[in-house]
Design a protein with these regions (language model features):
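N-terminal pre-catalytic segment of deacetylase/amide-hydrolase enzymes
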Residues: 1-15
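Short glycine-rich His-centered loop
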Residues: 11-34
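Active-site-proximal helix/loop segments of hydrolytic enzymes
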Residues: 3-7, 39-219
Length: 219
């Protein structure tokens, strides 16, 4: 009998957070209104979860259905309770820009009387972003522009309160991935199709695998 081969992520714990709806927003949508960010986040999150589990990862998801409302604080608390090696927050952007960007907490913020994340989590999240983003972009094979690695402080919410709410309450490395810009015609054409959504999930898997491989000595 041939023993089963361990997956690339055996023993690795990931919290997948399909963004929206939360206490702040229902999320964005394509210009024609036919595709919502909430739907893209959910569909890609489901596909990513299946891929991660197929590679042996333990996966916790922050909500049970697409339309469930979960606060950003609760989402972070789910990742913390699972002692996740990575809290991966899936979002889509809007605006005149294009491409995929990864955000990490670059400074502490304050929300509901809590200051966070800790300096150690900020450092760990930055390191995760530096490994994750290049792997994701490489796996997309030019399908989307590399919009880079950015701090939470560059976002509207993070600029006001110091960091994104999910990052403030995170006690594990936290990344927010703006997978595409739904209001950009190129990005929209890519992510609206099942093939594009599958490609995105596969690329995110590659990012997690790269981070897990780089983290293996301490796993």
């Amino acid at each position: 009998m041939v023993p089963a081969q361990a997956g690339s992520l055996t023993g690795f714990v990931v919290c997948v957070d399909p963004g929206h709806t939360s206490e702040t927003s229902e999320g964005t949508a394509s210009r024609d209104g036919r595709l919502t960010e909430r739907h893209v986040n959910w569909v890609v999150g489901e596909r990513l979860t299946a891929l991660l589990r197929a590679e042996g990862a333990t996966v916790v998801v922050t909500k049970a259905s697409e339309n469930q409302i979960v606060t950003n604080r609760k989402r972070a608390e789910t990742a913390n309770a699972a002692h996740a090696a990575l809290f991966l927050r899936l979002h889509c952007d809007s605006g005149e820009q294009s491409g995929l960007a990864t955000y990490y907490p670059d400074r502490q913020g304050r929300r509901f009387g809590v200051t966070g994340p800790s300096p150690a989590i900020m450092v760990a999240s930055h390191r995760a972003a530096q490994i994750f983003q290049p792997a994701v972009i490489a796996a997309l094979h030019g399908a989307l522009k590399n919009a880079g690695i950015k701090g939470d402080s560059k976002t509207g919410v993070g600029g006001k309160q110091g960091a994104l709410t999910g990052s403030i309450f995170a006690q594990v490395p936290a990344l927010t991935v703006e997978m595409c810009v739904l209001t950009n015609s190129h990005d929209y054409k890519f992510i609206r199709t099942p093939a594009g959504q599958d490609a995105m999930a596969q690329a995110l898997l590659a990012g997690v695998e790269a981070y897990a491989a780089a983290s293996s000595p301490v796993r």
